[in-house]
């Protein structure tokens, strides 16, 4: 029973979602030349770091989790694991993850993990989430770290491809998170968390969602235009982006139930990002040695 609780507090769903993006970044950089030992070490290292961050987040959010319907039954809220033990557990997970990335991958991968961790735990969870409407924006940077870590574990350098991945996943996080904040509006309001829908209203949030999806669309296409991914990826990226944008625009119809609309937008956001992760894993080369930007220039 205790094993289940120690697993639950690491938020396995979040770990799994992050691993899909790590795989996408790793295989994009590997271009078919896969070092399986490095691959497994990177997946395990990132899993441990993400798990650590989630446990720290659960520890920090104990007070507000009690006020939210979605989180009131979490392990630490119910006292199934003591706060002191959770801190030790989170620390051990983090140290193990950072050490594995440093020793089995490279220092860059580890430092990217450290930066993502510090932003999520130190900046977002401890301060921005509770104090600022821009908390989601800051948190999006940590959410974009896993695919970049996967990419840099192979490349051992932060190049244009890594930057594009950072942009894609950061921009994706915003509509994804805002959609959650809309259909969980009462939860965030009850916990006094200053997310955009609560502070500025759902109407303003819809405009932000639309703009971020347009930005996401441009960023996804850049992966092919810059010569990192192929045309099959491009077709899928364009298709899911246009469809997601269309769903966002549906939110402006007055007859729509905002919560139902936001939940659908949230679900499709997961489909969209996983589709891109899969496609960049398998379609990592363009047919020509030159990329499209060369021709456009």
From Swiss-Prot:
Further remarks about this protein from its record: Carbon 2 of the heme B porphyrin ring is defined according to the Fischer nomenclature.
Protein name: Protoheme IX farnesyltransferase
Function: Converts heme B (protoheme IX) to heme O by substitution of the vinyl group on carbon 2 of heme B porphyrin ring with a hydroxyethyl farnesyl side group.
tRNA-binding recorded as keyword: no
Record PANTHER family: PROTOHEME IX FARNESYLTRANSFERASE, MITOCHONDRIAL
Naturally occurring in which organism (per UniProt): Sodalis glossinidius (strain morsitans)
Membrane-spanning segments: 12-32, 36-56, 85-105, 108-128, 133-153, 163-183, 209-229, 230-250, 266-286
Catalytic activity: heme b + (2E,6E)-farnesyl diphosphate + H2O = Fe(II)-heme o + diphosphate
InterPro entries, sorted: Protohaem_IX_farnesylTrfase, UbiA_prenyltransferase, UbiA_prenylTrfase_CS, UbiA_sf
Single Gene Ontology BP annotation: heme O biosynthetic process
Record-stated family: Belongs to the UbiA prenyltransferase family. Protoheme IX farnesyltransferase subfamily.
Keywords from the named record: Cell inner membrane, Cell membrane, Heme biosynthesis, Membrane, Transferase, Transmembrane, Transmembrane helix
Gene3D superfamilies in the record: UbiA prenyltransferase
GO molecular function, one term: protoheme IX farnesyltransferase activity
One Gene Ontology cellular component: plasma membrane
Record flagged with keyword Membrane: yes
Subcellular location(s) per record: Cell inner membrane
EC number: 2.5.1.141
